[in-house]
Amino acid sequence: YSEEDIDKVINETTTIIIPEELLTKLLRKGINKNAIITVEPNKNYMVQEIKFETISAYNTNKTFHPKENGWVGYIIIINGIRYYIAGDTDITEENKQVKCDVAFVPVGGTYTMDFKEAASLINEIKPKIAIPIHYGSIVGTEQDAIDFIRLLHPEIKGIILMKK
């Protein structure tokens, strides 16, 4: 959740999709409740002709992102292609069941899975493309992204989007 990023995209036509637990923060910020749709983990949704699923996103061995908060990652389906954006999470029973074509997974460690854990998850769920995220600003380094790509099975294409 980033108020800075919300400020960059909010306008009179913006719809914000968030877990229920974050609703109060957005309302306090002055965002119109009609512009907000709340979601729960592990459900299917259709908003403005965009189909998506939510997947629980939480830590299993640290306290930063507790499961009880109901935070989520998203699988967005566009033209039949399934894009998984994991969110801030560790490997969980829920995300080990994800079926996707493209996966965006955190590799920074500390608040999320590290690059080794992320590669393990990706090698298990087997998307066609895997893209490391959540590194290079708060925690994690570009080397984590490089090491993540190195650990992927050969049939999975790893792509680094953040470059210096």
Give the positions of each predicted feature.
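Core dinuclear metal-dependent hydrolase active-site scaffold
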Residues: I37-K99, M113, M162-K164
